[in-house]
Amino acid sequence: QIKDLLVSSSTDLDTTLVLVNAIYFKGMWKTAFNAEDTREMPFHVTKQESKPVQMMCMNNSFNVATLPAEKMKILELPFASGDLSMLVLLPDEVSDLERIEKTINFEKLTEWTNPNTMEKRRVKVYLPQMKIEEKYNLTSVLMALGMTDLFIPSANLTGISSAESLKISQAVHGAFMELSEDGIEMAGSTGVIEDIKHSPESEQFRADHPFLFLIKHNPTNTIVYFGRYWSP
């Protein structure tokens, strides 16, 4: 699915070694969205600008956290595997994503999503179909993090090659992610219906403006994918 990660112009006669990393994710929900409920709706890129998006919709029971101090809601959507979940971090305001990006760290994320904060509630979820493909040159990023020795002629890479003066010429990363309505069971199964019957009237989680999302491996509490959805 990830094509042309390295274009011909990205290498030349001086290129000795290129570090390439790619990640592909196409998730299947534990509970499918009904494709008949998907509608074209506006996605508010800013307070002044919106773009059309195919918005999926489901009324079901999910783990949700409402964080008034952070002016944000968090929704957990489980995937079919049972080990993976998607967490959506939705600011209350259209223009508030940058503020959350500046304050978020692993400790805060762990606090926001722990069982004492998240609770299972009946929620009407609006979530755009997502198909994201991005490519990044990470050379300058890695050097800014202090990994400078890899990119200079005196790099010590004898553990992988006996070639002299071997260094990494550039580091390239590609990511592809696709999410649609597909799931392994339909909303409205007996267990879900009974759960919803004993819940108050459903609230809305309307992801119609920029948000953060992450894919988490629950058994190890490991984040395997972290991204931003800011425009269709």
Swiss-Prot record:
GO biological processes: defense response to Gram-negative bacterium; defense response to Gram-positive bacterium; response to corticosterone
Expression induction: Up-regulated by dietary stress. Significantly increased expression between days 0 to 5 in egg whites of eggs laid by corticosterone-fed hens (at protein level).
InterPro entries xref list: Serpin_CS, Serpin_dom, Serpin_fam, Serpin_sf, Serpin_sf_1, Serpin_sf_2
GO cellular component, one term: extracellular space
GO MF, any single term: heparin binding
Tissue localization of expression: Expressed in egg white (at protein level).
Family listed: Belongs to the serpin family. Ov-serpin subfamily.
UniProt protein name: Ovalbumin-related protein X
Organism: Gallus gallus
